[in-house]
Curated annotation (Swiss-Prot):
Keywords: Ribonucleoprotein, Ribosomal protein
Name of protein: Large ribosomal subunit protein uL13
Summary of subunit composition and partner proteins: Part of the 50S ribosomal subunit.
A GO molecular-function annotation: mRNA binding
Pfam families for the chain: Ribosomal_L13
Regions annotated as coiled coil: none
Organism (species): Shewanella amazonensis (strain ATCC BAA-1098 / SB2B)
Protein role: This protein is one of the early assembly proteins of the 50S ribosomal subunit, although it is not seen to bind rRNA by itself. It is important during the early stages of 50S assembly.
Family: Belongs to the universal ribosomal protein uL13 family.
HAMAP family named among the record's database cross-references: Ribosomal_uL13
Length: 142
């Protein structure tokens, strides 16, 4: 018996909606990353993008445990000397709540062209509304 390898043109992709309200950041991010990779499917192939589309709503209401709300820092660099910037979780949640989930999930995906293709299937929204109703997404409980 030969090992099954999924072909990119035969992969079927579904759309799912995840409500992040009251959920812990790491626990929701690991499940989203796994679904984006397609590891929940029997036809999973590591070098083929077999994952589904994920829509995350209520990103502004995601939680972290312990003192991470005040202590967890996010860093960015402009590329110029002395150009490092830092912002903590609370301020980033008030300013750009989508970026918190995007950054957590992106770090869990493979690096390179395949990981970037997987990341493009993630849609994150701060509020409860999204504009993907035409895709008829299913609700995913995490």
């Amino acid at each position: 018996m030969k090992t099954f390898t999924a072909k990119p043109e035969t992969v079927s992709r579904d759309w799912y909606v995840v409500d992040a309200e009251g959920k812990t950041l790491g626990r929701i991010a690991t499940e989203i990353a796994s679904r984006l990779r397609g590891k929940h499917k029997p036809e999973y192939t590591p070098h083929v993008d077999t994952g589904d589309y994920i829509i995350v709503i209520n990103a502004e209401k995601v939680t972290v445990t312990g003192n991470k709300a005040a202590g967890k820092m996010y860093y960015s660099h402009s590329g110029f000397p002395g150009g490092i910037k830092e912002i903590n979780f609370e301020k980033l949640q008030a300013h750009k709540p989508e970026m918190i989930i995007e950054k957590a999930v992106k770090g869990m995906l493979p690096k390179g062209p395949l990981g970037r293709a997987m990341f493009r299937k993630l849609k994150v929204y701060a509020g409860a509304e999204h504009n993907h109703a035409a895709q008829q997404p299913q609700v995913l409980d995490i």
